[in-house]
């Protein structure tokens, strides 16, 4: 994803893997809640392949092209089902989203992807600018010097954050949790 993998792999004890989902045939979540019974999504596809990798990982970088000021629909289907069907604690796994556009829609897409992290107690790695890079055709993003610098800073910041959290867990443990309270707006 925009040259981030080598940057993460160069960092001490960090290993990154790219998984491309945009070209896959993936259906959206139907909120059937069978994942609670099965321990995995009822639709047996790439989502169930990603779930154990996600559980083991210290962080997750999600990258998407921008389509109509939103992320790739297949990616959103994968993320929705991945986050919904995995019931392990995601607290303090570091998340980062990266978007690529010809011109506009980056901020809206960036926000859309970050919501998966924030609802899951996952801190978000930041950079010196929003994590976006520009280019339409393959290879054009390589010409975006500011975007490439933003990606390098993001890789370093995310690696630092994951290492800091690992040290913090060792020394202090995870933050205290509360039983989740649910508010229903229908009275």
Task: Outline where the language-model segments fall.
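Glycine-rich phosphate/pyrophosphate-binding loop and the adjoining helix
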Residues: 123-187
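Residue-level recognition of specific faces of alpha-helices
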Residues: 28-31, 53, 81, 150
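N-terminal beta-loop-helix "entrance" segment that forms/cooperates
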Residues: 20-41, 137-140
